[in-house]
UniProtKB/Swiss-Prot annotation:
It comes from Clostridium acetobutylicum (strain ATCC 824 / DSM 792 / JCM 1419 / IAM 19013 / LMG 5710 / NBRC 13948 / NRRL B-527 / VKM B-1787 / 2291 / W). Catalyzes two activities which are involved in the cyclic version of arginine biosynthesis: the synthesis of N-acetylglutamate from glutamate and acetyl-CoA as the acetyl donor, and of ornithine by transacetylation between N(2)-acetylornithine and glutamate. It catalyses: N(2)-acetyl-L-ornithine + L-glutamate = N-acetyl-L-glutamate + L-ornithine; L-glutamate + acetyl-CoA = N-acetyl-L-glutamate + CoA + H(+). Its main location: cytoplasm. This is Arginine biosynthesis bifunctional protein ArgJ 1. One of its GO terms (molecular function) is glutamate N-acetyltransferase activity. GO terms for cellular component: cytoplasm. It holds the Pfam family ArgJ. Heterotetramer of two alpha and two beta chains. Substrate binds at T154, K180, T191, E277, N403, S408. PANTHER family: ARGININE BIOSYNTHESIS BIFUNCTIONAL PROTEIN ARGJ (PTHR23100), ARGININE BIOSYNTHESIS BIFUNCTIONAL PROTEIN ARGJ, MITOCHONDRIAL (PTHR23100:SF0). Gene3D superfamilies: ArgJ beta chain, C-terminal domain, L-amino peptidase D-ALA esterase/amidase. Keywords: Acyltransferase, Amino-acid biosynthesis, Arginine biosynthesis, Autocatalytic cleavage, Cytoplasm, Multifunctional enzyme, Transferase.
Amino acid sequence: MDTIKVLNNKNITDVPYFKAIGVASGIKGNNKSDLCVIYSEKPCIAAGTFTTNKVKAAPVLLDLKHIESENIYAIVANSGNANACTGDDGYEKAYLMAECTAKHLKIKPEEVLVASTGVIGVPLPIDKVMFGIEKAFSILPKSDANKAIDAIMTTDTVQKKIFVEFMLDKKKVTICAIAKGSGMIHPNMATMLSFIVTDANITKDLLNKALKESVKDSYNMISVDRDTSTNDMALLLANGASGNTLISSENSDYEVFKKALHYVNVEISKMIAKDGEGATKLIEAKVFGASSSRDAKVAAKSVITSNLVKAAVFGSDANWGRIICALGYSAAEIDPSKVDISFSNNDSKVETCLKGTGLNFDEEAAKKILDGDHVIIEVNLNNGKFNATAWGCDLTYDYVKINGSYRS
């Protein structure tokens, strides 16, 4: 079983036959990149997961139809405007984005997926978007993957990307994901925007299955502010260029592919959580010993979404009482008299609660852990055999500042 190799110097355009560029179309102004095109010179099969928010942005509604196409070649995405709550006009503009991209690639509009992120309820400035698409294709096929990532960022402070390679059927296979996400992150079936590309040769049904199974334990297990966006999506394109034997059953090759895809999605999820708006720390909640998989996930997410827990981590306060409180009001089945809680990092661990009762623990040692930029909260419910992990971030003064002036 095969080793997954992470290559930090590689990017989305290092996956064979994929091209990408980002340009400034004028949506954001100040010559900031705000439109990207990603496409494959070979036809792809595609899978996607989308926001469960009842209010869905126009690009999401469009993609729910286009994702069913036999072939997908491209993704076109803009930042600075969500094209959400914009009615029929917004849907028509999302289609125009696909149509304009398709014209340049000499393909059908339904073979293009569309994404937008930014302010909700403002009409999409389609003239600027069209200008941006024309500008992008005046540069392509010359690629610049970093500019493509920049073009989908809003309040993000760092780029989010990961590139892995592994072996399937004695063929080298690659997967790369780029993403944006900082605020309004509490996904259910998707993330903010995550674009994943691979040269694996796999059927559409199994690509869908692998993505949906992975999303449950990656993007769906992160939260920054408990707000599920109108625009959330994770898109996965596979062009089959690696030449591995077609994965058409849930065999060992499928398991290897699924493992690599899940690794990519988990790492991107952690990057998004760590870059929460104003965040200074990544919080990782590990729950053990739950009576069901659902209870484990519910308990872990309750810990990382608690504002009191998040604020305590920001202040390096080992206030385990807030953690057991969050477990208690969650929908998970727990027996408080069985719960153990500890704080840890990669170097040390401090137990603070045993069987629901506080311990006389070393406050300074706990504070040292909490002062770090990656805080692990371990909870053992001692109630079963199921485990789960969720990721979030601390709650800082800057979160309020950023979101108090987002439109300005």
